[in-house]
Amino acid sequence: MTMQIKIKYLDETQTRISKIEQGDWIDLRAAEDVTIKKDEFKLVPLGVAMELPEGYEAHVVPRSSTYKNFGVIQTNSMGVIDESYKGDNDFWFFPAYALRDTEIKKGDRICQFRIMKKMPAVELVEVEHLGNEDRGGLGSTGTK
C-alpha cells in the first residue's frame, strides 16, 4: 500500500517533487536564489511543508553532490522533522554552512529526504554488567 503525504508548496513557482523508482530518497530544491559567503551560515528555504503520517518522521540529508556543486555542508549532519511539524507555515529549510563563496539558484537540488518510522517507546534499564566482553570500538575491528 502506498503512503500518502500531504504537501503544501510555498507558491505556484515551486517545482513539484515526487519519488522516483530508482531510490528511497526524494530530492528537495532551493525555493529561492541564495548567496552564501565563505564561513557564513544560512537557512536555505526548500519551499515545502508536509503533514507526515502519525508515527513517522522525515530524515533530511545533503545529496552526494551538494558539497561538490555548492561547497556547503549541512550543519546538523542530518535533519529530523517529526510528525508534529505540520502547520501551514511549517516550511522546511536546509541549514547550510559555506566552505567557499557560493550561489544556490532557485530549483537547485540541494538535499534529499526519506520517511522513517519513529523509534518505539523504550525503557532504559541500568545494570552493572552487559553480559559481554569489551570489543574495542573506534576503528579497532580487524586490527589484530
UniProtKB/Swiss-Prot annotation:
DUTP binds at S64, N76, Y85, F93. It is an enzyme of class 3 (hydrolase). The keyword Magnesium applies. GO terms for molecular function: dUTP diphosphatase activity; magnesium ion binding. Pathway: Pyrimidine metabolism; dUMP biosynthesis; dUMP from dCTP (dUTP route): step 2/2. The active site is at D82. Disruption phenotype: No visible phenotype; double yncF-yosS deletions (both encode dUTPases) are also viable. SUPFAM superfamilies: dUTPase-like. GO terms for biological process: dUMP biosynthetic process; dUTP catabolic process. Keywords: Hydrolase, Magnesium, Metal-binding, Nucleotide metabolism. The keyword Hydrolase applies. Signal peptide: none annotated. Binds 1 Mg(2+) per subunit, coordinated entirely by the nucleotide and ordered water molecules. Its cofactor is Mg(2+). It holds the Pfam family dUTPase. It catalyses: dUTP + H2O = dUMP + diphosphate + H(+). It comes from the Bacteria. Its EC number is 3.6.1.23. Involved in nucleotide metabolism: produces dUMP, the immediate precursor of thymidine nucleotides and decreases the intracellular concentration of dUTP, so that uracil cannot be incorporated into DNA. The Ser-64 side chain changes its position upon ligand-binding to make contacts with the nucleotide phosphates. The uracil deoxyribose moiety interacts with the protein through Ile-81 and Tyr-85, which discriminate against the ribose form of the nucleotide. Homotrimer. Belongs to the dUTPase family. This is Deoxyuridine 5'-triphosphate nucleotidohydrolase YncF. It comes from Bacillus subtilis (strain 168).
